[in-house]
Swiss-Prot record:
Record's bilayer topology term: Multi-pass membrane protein
High-level lineage: Bacteria, Pseudomonadati, Pseudomonadota, Gammaproteobacteria, Enterobacterales
Reported phenotype of the disruption mutant: Mutant lacking this gene fails to grow on both glycerol-3-phosphate and glycerol-2-phosphate.
Record protein name field: sn-glycerol-3-phosphate transport system permease protein UgpA
Keywords: Cell inner membrane, Cell membrane, Membrane, Transmembrane, Transmembrane helix, Transport
Molecular function terms, GO-annotated: glycerol-3-phosphate transmembrane transporter activity; glycerophosphodiester transmembrane transporter activity
Gene field: ugpA
Amino acid sequence: MSSSRPVFRSRWLPYLLVAPQLIITVIFFIWPAGEALWYSLQSVDPFGFSSQFVGLDNFVTLFHDSYYLDSFWTTIKFSTFVTVSGLLVSLFFAALVEYIVRGSRFYQTLMLLPYAVAPAVAAVLWIFLFNPGRGLITHFLAEFGYDWNHAQNSGQAMFLVVFASVWKQISYNFLFFYAALQSIPRSLIEAAAIDGAGPIRRFFKIALPLIAPVSFFLLVVNLVYAFFDTFPVIDAATSGGPVQATTTLIYKIYREGFTGLDLASSAAQSVVLMFLVIVLTVVQFRYVESKVRYQ
């Protein structure tokens, strides 16, 4: 089977088609990334008017800062909780669609509603429900003798931001898992049922391996989501507290750059975070292309 490359009448047309994307990439990624890398090697005054080259001193100081290391491990813990919990809960709800006979459309619509809610609004919603004084959920917990106050308890604060972040991301994961499960040939499921395999066994032995590429894709997407898109949730719910218990890397960058006006340190932290995201992207492009072949 022979293949030929498309031929454009004008030699400039391909460049014109690619130009908008290149311009957006340069303005909104390459230029800011270059600025962050430059500032990370400088000692900058709070207003950014003067600077002095200091090499890697900002990075050395960064990795000797106990508060930064704490935020680093907080990010690892937070992103792990958000990613694992979000994927498991979404997969469970997507698998339930097959067993809902009546009201399945309403169920699917209900599962997609959180996606229409902004992250900050999602955080405020759960803050109202978990309000220590008048929250509906805290009142219910008080009936069982459990005292809830996420402003003073670091574990409760972490649970709140993880819960709100997972709730916000459920719709996105549910949509992909549902589409992946529906794409599985029904003949495989029916053949396994005829052979005596129950619903649980059919799910773990047939469905789960076949949706592995989608699961891996969502794993990477949810890690990036936990690193970046959860900033509004943390800012609205806990502001990184109590005692920096919920201060992630992205929130520490914001606090030191915009509040503390330490541009060099925040730039160095941005470079470290950018490196982590690049690694995740490389992993995604390297492994997510694995194909599933139906025999």
